[in-house]
């Protein structure tokens, strides 16, 4: 008998509801609802429109019912962001977007109380101003009245699950993105939070990925005409959902989850926390079955997406195919940027910032759209090579290829450049890795799939992969030396 499970996958700019049909051998995807996810700026603060997003969840549930129904629900989202509930379980305010400027300078402020080395050794998480810890410290500093009224904090996938079931809990993978989880105990680092004045009473119990989060509430079932089904706490962080779906037969593999953000790393049984991992600021994120995703967050397709939006604001509506074609026609290796330089994080004039970065670093300043796009593409590929070297240094392993998963697998130019820069084959696919990982954990939770190895085998069988062989590697190796100079 076919099993049907419903996955909600929220990205930074859109969301989908997708039914996974499992016949015991293969997983087939059926998209039933798609919607935009548009942050809203109000009086200088950037918010997520969480109530509209919950409306879209209800729309997805209704459409999935009309498409034949489903046996369970799983929700994954981006990391770090959260909602605060009062003592009556009511949302205090819309969750604030990780790109909001409120966390500027908070890392250094936290280091005055908890030194960098101590915080990393306890949490194993890459330092980024957008991490939940720094968001909460900013909230305590600038809007303490909100924190004073908070009874519970829920990360985005857990918040949506709470709206469906009424249960408050924190799924392990999404909790680790906060930089507030003790890497050894896999529980909250209560003592560190106490020293920073963060009230630990707002935290909810951490549960393993695949834990049931209760049944759809009677209210939701009555409103939408649904039968009660279970909501599963899948890997709530979309990165970890995607890692679950890496179609590798090997126990040790390199992956690049390519989307708005690029997450480059490997999966390991135990965290790696030492001077090397600290010096390169690499993250140990919790995954399914207690595994660790050793990875580096890199600004990814955001640079291309936001550049396209900027040109559209200026009256030029280029397609992604147009941008790729213009990049290919431009001269290679004329200039580079560091994609992770802070000026590239906020929305706005990315092309102008690319020019300014090149000017400041004494490089050729790109003039045309094609030159800017070539610079972005090559810089991303070079950053992947740099990160690949870091992963190999940390683990002491070599990796025969790189699995590129997620939406970026559709970008053939970036996949080829990644193979060229890293000098290993790239295996691209599945595009819907996050959704497939979400579905796989639901099927693992129900016992329909026995283990993660079998899940990956099924996904590999269900999805076609495309391979890119490296070429022009000597030219890329020479240009890499120029790229390294602008990182210093």
How does the language model describe each region?
Residues 69-77, 152, 205, 397-406:
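Short glycine-rich phosphate-binding loop at a beta-alpha junction
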Residues 6-7, 19, 104, 111-123, ...:
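Active-site core segments that coordinate phosphate-bearing ligands/cofactors
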Residues 62-97, 126-130, 161-182, 205-208:
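Short beta-strand-loop/turn "lid" adjacent to the catalytic site in phosphate-handling enzymes
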Residues 52-65, 185-191, 383-390:
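Short, well-ordered amphipathic alpha-helical segments that serve as non-catalytic structural scaffolds
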Residues 1-93, 121, 221-231, 422-424:
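N-terminal glycine/serine-rich phosphate-binding loop of ATP-dependent small-molecule kinases
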Residues 11-13, 71, 76-78, 132, ...:
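Short, basic and Ser/Thr-rich N-terminal targeting/leader segments
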Residues 100:
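Carbohydrate-associated surface elements
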Residues 76-80, 209-210, 258-261, 401-409:
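Glycine-rich beta-strand-to-loop/alpha-helix junction loops that act as flexible
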């Amino acid at each position: 008998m076919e099993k049907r499970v419903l996955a909600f996958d929220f990205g930074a700019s859109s969301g989908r509801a997708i039914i996974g049909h499992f016949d015991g051998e293969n997983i087939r995807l059926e998209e039933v609802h798609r919607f935009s996810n548009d942050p809203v700026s109000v009086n200088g603060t950037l918010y997520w429109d969480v109530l509209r997003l919950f409306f879209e969840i209800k729309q997805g549930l209704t459409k999935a019912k009309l498409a034949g129904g489903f046996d369970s629900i799983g929700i994954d989202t981006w990391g770090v962001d959260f909602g605060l509930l009062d003592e009556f379980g009511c949302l205090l305010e819309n969750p604030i977007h990780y790109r909001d400027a409120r966390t500027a300078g908070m890392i250094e402020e936290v280091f005055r109380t908890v030194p960098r080395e101590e915080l990393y050794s306890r949490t194993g998480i890459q330092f980024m101003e957008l991490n939940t810890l720094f968001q909460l410290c900013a909230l305590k500093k600038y809007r303490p009245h909100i924190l004073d009224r908070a009874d519970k904090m829920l990360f985005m996938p857990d918040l949506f699950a709470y709206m469906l079931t009424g249960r408050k809990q924190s799924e392990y993978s999404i909790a680790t993105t906060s930089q507030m989880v003790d890497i050894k105990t896999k529980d909250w680092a209560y003592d560190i939070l106490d020293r920073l004045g963060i009230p630990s009473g707002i935290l909810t119990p951490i549960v393993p990925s695949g834990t049931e989060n209760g049944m759809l509430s009677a209210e939701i079932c009555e409103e939408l005409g649904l039968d009660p089904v279970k909501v599963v706490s899948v890997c709530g962080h979309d990165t970890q959902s995607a890692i679950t779906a890496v179609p590798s037969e090997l126990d040790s593999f390199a992956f690049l989850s390519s989307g708005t953000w690029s997450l480059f790393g490997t999966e390991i049984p135990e965290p790696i926390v030492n001077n090397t991992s600290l010096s390169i600021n690499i993250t140990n994120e919790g995954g399914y079955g207690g595994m660790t995703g050793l990875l580096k967050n890199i600004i990814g397709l955001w640079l291309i997406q936001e550049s396209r939006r900027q040109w559209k604001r200026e009256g030029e509506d280029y397609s992604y195919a147009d941008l790729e074609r213009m990049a290919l026609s431009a001269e290679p290796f004329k200039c580079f940027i560091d994609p992770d330089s802070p000026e590239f994080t906020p929305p706005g004039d990315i092309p102008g910032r690319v020019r300014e970065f090149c000017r400041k670093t004494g490089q050729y300043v790109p003039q045309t759209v094609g030159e800017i796009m070539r610079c972005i593409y090559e810089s991303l590929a070079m950053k992947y090579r740099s990160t690949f070297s870091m992963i190999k240094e940390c683990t002491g392993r070599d990796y025969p290829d790189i699995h590129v998963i997620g939406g970026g697998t559709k970008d053939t130019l970036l996949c080829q450049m990644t193979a060229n820069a890293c000098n290993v084959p790239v295996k691209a696919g599945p595009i819907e890795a996050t959704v497939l990982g979400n579905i796989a954990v639901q099927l693992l939770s129900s016992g329909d799939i026995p283990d993660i190895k079998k899940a990956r085998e099924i996904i590999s069988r269900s999805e076609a992969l495309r391979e890119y062989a490296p070429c022009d590697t000597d030219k890329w190796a020479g240009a890499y030396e120029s790229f390294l100079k602008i990182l210093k």
